[in-house]
């Protein structure tokens, strides 16, 4: 049994629920009424387990929706889910779920990112962008080695970037 210590509104319909002083999950207004959740009320273990299942399923669906829009790194997806008000265990379950289907793969993301931009960006720029997106430096190095991205590619990217400059742009 756990005690609801605080219910904090996120929007007109969504609320953050704190159990025993710790953030537990985000619920919709209808779920608060359906499960009779109010501040200082007690939540039985079976209701808590039921809520956890609902929230985990919701996090998985949200992860799938986020990935349908565009490819993301594991770090980016984790951040978006946390920003959406999902608890850590629901976020981890959603990450495991999408990974199990191969919908999220930082190595493939890095390969695609490098292949699509190596004509316009230097190796340093690509490396920095991928690390900023949450891809580990080991994965980035591995993908650069596999792609055989050398100095010639880097020089070509710099040359392409200079061809876009015009005289008035340089003189500004």
What are these regions (language model features)?
Residues 1-165, 172:
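An alpha-helical, amphipathic repeat domain used for nucleic-acid recognition
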